[in-house]
A protein has these predicted regions:
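Surface-exposed helix-capping loop/turn segments at secondary-structure junctions
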Residues: 38-42, 84-92, 284-288, 331-336
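Gly/serine-rich nucleotide phosphate-binding loop at the start of the catalytic core
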Residues: 1-71
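Acidic carboxylate diad motif detector
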Residues: 49-166, 315
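Short coil/turn segments at secondary-structure boundaries
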Residues: 35, 39, 45-46, 87-101, ...
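Generic detection of short hydrophobic beta-strand segments and adjacent strand-loop junctions
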Residues: 5-9, 139-150, 220-225
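Stable alpha-helical structural segments in soluble proteins, enriched in small hydrophobic residues
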Residues: 33, 71-83, 378-388, 392
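Positively charged, helix-rich recognition surfaces that bind polyanionic ligands
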Residues: 3-4, 17, 168-404
Length: 404
């Protein structure tokens, strides 16, 4: 299981000067090798990772060391492989129609290079609250204090250093192949063993961020309204400030970028908390598999109004929720599967038939055959689970669940 620890660096003025120069050179390496690979791609040629790395290696190895150049080039390879994977998924019809995969971007913000340092695991070591960097080419060696707790134990991997424009701070991200993790005040071996063998279905939504139905009939809802509030608050603030910029003839600014980043950070924090609480609860219920419904094509529905589009594209962060579900569930030995949620909101759990217009008011589902009324999101969660589990305990009271 791979995870990363993020620590805030506390460099002196002299150390920050070295970090800035080193990280700017790192950004140059990324941009140079990315340029060569983009040229090959747009000319219709196979992207030659080895050839392009060798070119950039010779250009920069004396400045920041051969190992550092290699690590940055190989991180760029990962971005390209992810892009090619998305292209394959697009060709196979596995992605929404509106989604168009794009090649890796350059490290630039408003014309300025975005700082990046990537080091191999033998180029750094940690002593107390001090990070020691070595093998840095003409920069040789650098020692920097850090603030934060390393809450993971295991084999250390690649280290990255970035600069956060929003907080105006330097951060290091250290990857681990994790064996133990601090939970509370105790070191716990991870991944854990599941406490049972049940499966749970999860329907993702707006007012209910997650509706959860377990095959034994247990169910609960996870509130999504605070996430909407975060989005509406920042939308108004950003729109007001953007209006002022427009009047002055300016399209963007560092402050505007910081506002967008703060909105993302707040939304991500809420999602992280909600997902962890959900997974912990499912672990206690004996769940070993989570089945999540993914609503293809809904995030860019042009027929919806601007208000609804904002919710779907900025608040309804399906990909972030699913990614965090996978990451947190892995710690508990729980497997996450993603299925197409098509027709899950229209099928009655009791009669088993699909009904158009059964969702007659917000959050309610009424079966025209049985006359029963359920929570619409829990109906979705039940039917999502049914795509993977054929025998499910139908608990009618569980389909009326309140937020837990």
């Amino acid at each position: 299981m791979k995870r990363a620890v993020t620590l805030k660096l506390q460099p002196s003025k002299e150390q920050e000067k070295v970090l800035s120069e080193l990280a700017d050179t790192g950004a140059k390496v990324w941009n140079r090798v990315n340029y060569l690979r983009r040229q090959e791609f747009f000319e219709g040629k196979p992207v030659d990772f080895n050839r392009t790395e060798k070119i950039v290696y010779e250009e920069f190895k004396r400045e920041i060391s051969s190992a550092t150049v290699q690590q940055i080039c190989r991180k760029n390879v990962e971005a390209w492989r992810s892009f090619f994977s998305l292209l394959r998924s697009k060709r196979n019809g596995e992605l929404p129609e509106w989604f168009k995969p794009k090649p890796p971007n350059y490290l630039k913000d408003d014309g300025e290079r975005r700082p990046l340092i990537v080091l191999r695991n033998d180029q750094y070591k940690i002593e107390g609250n001090k990070l020691i960097l070595k093998g840095l080419g003409k920069f040789k060696r650098l020692e920097v204090q850090f603030n934060g707790r390393i809450h993971l134990k295991g084999k250390q991997g690649r280290l990255e250093i970035t600069y956060d424009e929003v907080k105006r701070k330097w951060y290091t991200h250290i990857s681990f192949t994790v064996g133990e993790k601090i939970i509370g005040d105790e070191w716990v071996r991870v991944p854990r063993q599941p406490s049972g063998n049940l499966s749970a279905g999860i329907d993702l939504g707006v007012n209910n961020l997650m509706a959860v139905y377990v095959e034994n009939g247990e169910s609960f809802l996870v509130n999504g309204r605070p996430l909407k509030s975060i989005a509406f608050y920042w939308r108004k603030r950003i729109a007001d400030y953007q209006s002022k910029l427009n009047k002055s003839g300016v399209k963007t600014s560092k402050k505007l970028r910081r506002m967008h980043e703060k909105a993302k950070l707040q939304a991500r924090h809420y999602i992280n908390t909600a997902v962890r609480q959900t997974v912990e609860r499912l672990y206690q219920l004996g769940v070993s598999r989570i089945v999540v419904g993914y609503p293809k094509g809904i995030a860019r529905n042009s027929e919806r109004g601007k208000k609804q589009n904002f919710l779907l594209s900025h608040v309804w962060r399906f990909n972030t929720v699913i990614q965090r579900l996978r990451e947190v569930a892995e710690e508990y030995g729980i497997v996450v599967e993603v299925v197409d949620e098509a027709f899950t909101s229209k099928t009655c759990p009791v009669c088993g038939k699909s009904h158009e217009g059964a969702r007659f008011v917000r959050e309610l589902f009424k079966c025209p055959v049985t006359g029963l009324v359920f929570n619409a999101d829990l109906v979705g969660a039940f039917n999502i689970l049914k795509k993977a589990v054929k025998t499910i305990t139908l608990n009618l009271s569980g389909l009326y669940a309140q937020r837990g």
